[in-house]
């Protein structure tokens, strides 16, 4: 199971009070650990009772499986914490986020020792949670700072940079290296490109430079493309076909997988509309 912390709300509720924020994290992680332990016990019981016969054939127990604590909205946490004086792109905002992740990791180590079960810290993909957290918080706290617009609110994924921060992929890699290395579970930096790269050699060069010079666990190269009913694949973001002006179906990655933009939830559409693509010219 996965429990995700709403870091943006924490930044709002404990603005300027880091000790209070971390104390609240203590309580939330403790609640998360208790919830995940109950879930593990329930699923284990059902496994033993034969409710997962195919799983049981290959998986005698869940002892080697992790329970996960994740984070979402660290950029908005910093913005709310500082009354929008700066965000995660500022060294002070990045340092605050690093301290948060270190603190959660220490709590996870204690949880493992206490329970005897495996726990990890993950950059939760949060395909729907980025929007749901922001939507629910706006109902409770109308003046809370969020990304996107009033119509399309969302929180920035995990401890990622704001989606419109830079077109330079190496600037993003440099900023994210320290933060993403702190996760003990899943984390990835998606390099959203505005279109297909010029050729395979350019793509290979980008991947090689990224992996040789930085220590991020995972990266993806994510081009945006469009599909015309008449002319098929078109590289890049084209709401209408440049050949026949028909409405196209635009595709890009929504975290772990590619989907048509039209099927995105409201928050993810807001993120898509705000995104500044990384540029191949920096490679």
Residue ranges of model-derived segments:
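Long, C-terminal-biased catalytic regions of enzyme "large/alpha" subunits
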Residues: 1-283
